[in-house]
UniProtKB/Swiss-Prot annotation:
Residues 347-366 have a biased composition (Polar residues). InterPro entries: CDK, Kinase-like_dom_sf, Prot_kinase_dom, Protein_kinase_ATP_BS, Ser/Thr_kinase_AS. This is Cyclin-dependent kinase 9. Residues 343-372 are annotated as: Disordered. It comes from Bos taurus (Bovine). GO terms for molecular function: 7SK snRNA binding; ATP binding; chromatin binding; cyclin-dependent protein serine/threonine kinase activity; protein serine kinase activity; protein serine/threonine kinase activity; RNA polymerase II CTD heptapeptide repeat kinase activity. The gene is CDK9. The active site is at D149 (proton acceptor). Its EC number is 2.7.11.22, 2.7.11.23. It catalyses: L-seryl-[protein] + ATP = O-phospho-L-seryl-[protein] + ADP + H(+); L-threonyl-[protein] + ATP = O-phospho-L-threonyl-[protein] + ADP + H(+); [DNA-directed RNA polymerase] + ATP = phospho-[DNA-directed RNA polymerase] + ADP + H(+). Protein kinase involved in the regulation of transcription. Member of the cyclin-dependent kinase pair (CDK9/cyclin-T) complex, also called positive transcription elongation factor b (P-TEFb), which facilitates the transition from abortive to productive elongation by phosphorylating the CTD (C-terminal domain) of the large subunit of RNA polymerase II (RNAP II) POLR2A, SUPT5H and RDBP. This complex is inactive when in the 7SK snRNP complex form. Phosphorylates EP300, MYOD1, RPB1/POLR2A and AR and the negative elongation factors DSIF and NELFE.
Length: 372
């Protein structure tokens, strides 16, 4: 067994012992993430341990896909894969060596920043965050890659204020359907609260609009400080989407009745679209409201794409996008969702945010309850 694992681990990879682990900063179904530093140079990195537990036939295909995609993507707003390291198989690790993906270290993730009441984004800074996020999406989509897990926790920000799309564990290449043969991608992707309605209805021939829906959820979250639709089940998530974006019908979404689950799930009837009405108490800027409204369109064919979103008046009206470095320089501690206190389900944010100045929704608490 040891020999088998040693052969599937890259034999030309360095030992991970060249790095010293400093702290765990993330954990999930994907494995664990650690902050670490290079023992000789002192360079700070993030080590993502590849989960091997259920892989009886060698290296996980999902990890191979992630590595291949990250080696392809080189952009300021996409996380940078430095190298791949390993530990050798031995009796001490049940003859299972480990693989680590080594990334440039980013000091924060967006979910961690939004969880802290002391972090206050101005409207200009929100514009810069969304501009970088959409730039990253534009780049990966131009390179025919879908992220498929857009959420605030997967948006990293460096201490210099540079945003990086991260966690490409669910990402995949996409292509336009050819010869009337639709693609058959899995629809069991994207964290539930950020999952678009087409995936919830069983669509398997999808494309970049699924990531733009997530971008819309994240953009609204910049003001609400909380995921805006927190369903407990897929059925519940569809109900929340209908309550915000209007009932899902063929009148507003042509051919939606052709989706596999359209007749099988109970869809809320008689709901009017009220994205702007529901969010205007938080989002005071009319251009911001309009862009969120265009990102959270039910029909993926009518949902705004990253190119048009970047040309939206939101980014070209006063105040213009401004650098995050100054604001972040006042926060010396890294902020990650994993390190934030656990949230109590069911509580509501009642504060309203102007974000026109450094005085968004605040309370006497140190942390926001991230429930909208």
């Amino acid at each position: 067994m040891a020999k088998q694992y040693d052969s599937v681990e890259c034999p030309f990879c360095d030992e991970v012992t060249k790095y010293e682990k400093l702290a765990k900063i993330g954990q999930g179904t994907f494995g664990e993430v650690f902050k670490a530093k290079h023992r000789k140079t002192g360079q700070k990195v993030a080590l993502k341990k590849v989960l091997m537990e259920n892989e009886k036939e060698g290296f996980p295909i999902t990890a191979l896909r992630e590595i291949k995609i990250l080696q392809l993507l080189k952009h300021e707003n996409v996380v940078n894969l430095i190298e791949i390291c390993r530990t050798k198989a031995s009796p001490y690790n049940r003859c299972k060596g480990s693989i680590y993906l080594v990334f440039d270290f980013c000091e924060h993730d967006l979910a961690g920043l939004l969880s802290n009441v002391l972090v206050k984004f101005t409207l200009s800074e929100i514009k810069r965050v969304m501009q970088m996020l959409l730039n990253g999406l534009y780049y990966i989509h131009r390179n025919k890659i879908l992220h498929r897990d857009m959420k605030a926790a997967n948006v990293l920000i460096t201490r210099d204020g540079v945003l990086k799309l991260a966690d490409f564990g669910l990402a995949r290449a996409f292509s336009l359907a050819k010869n009337s043969q639709p693609n058959r991608y899995t629809n069991r992707v994207v964290t539930l609260w950020y999952r678009p309605p087409e995936l919830l209805l069983g669509e398997r021939d999808y494309g970049p609009p699924i990531d733009l829906w997530g971008a819309g959820c994240i953009m609204a979250e910049m003001w609400t400080r909380s995921p805006i639709m927190q369903g407990n089940t897929e059925q519940h998530q569809l109900a929340l989407i209908s309550q915000l974006c209007g009932s899902i019908t063929p009148e507003v979404w042509p051919n939606v009745d052709k989706y596999e689950l359209f007749e099988k799930v109970e869809l809320v009837k008689g709901q009017k679209r009220k994205v702007k009405d529901r969010l205007k108490a938080y989002v005071r800027d009319p251009y911001a409201l309009d862009l969120i409204d265009k990102l959270l369109v039910l029909d993926p064919a009518q949902r705004i794409d990253s190119d048009d979103a970047l040309n939206h008046d939101f980014f070209w009206s006063d105040p213009m996008p401004s650098d995050l470095k100054g604001m972040l320089s006042t926060h010396l501690t890294s902020m990650f969702e994993y390190l934030a206190p656990p949230r109590r389900k069911g509580s509501q944010i009642t504060q309203q945010s102007t974000n026109q100045s450094r005085n968004p929704a605040t309370t006497n608490q140190t942390e926001f309850e991230r429930v909208f």
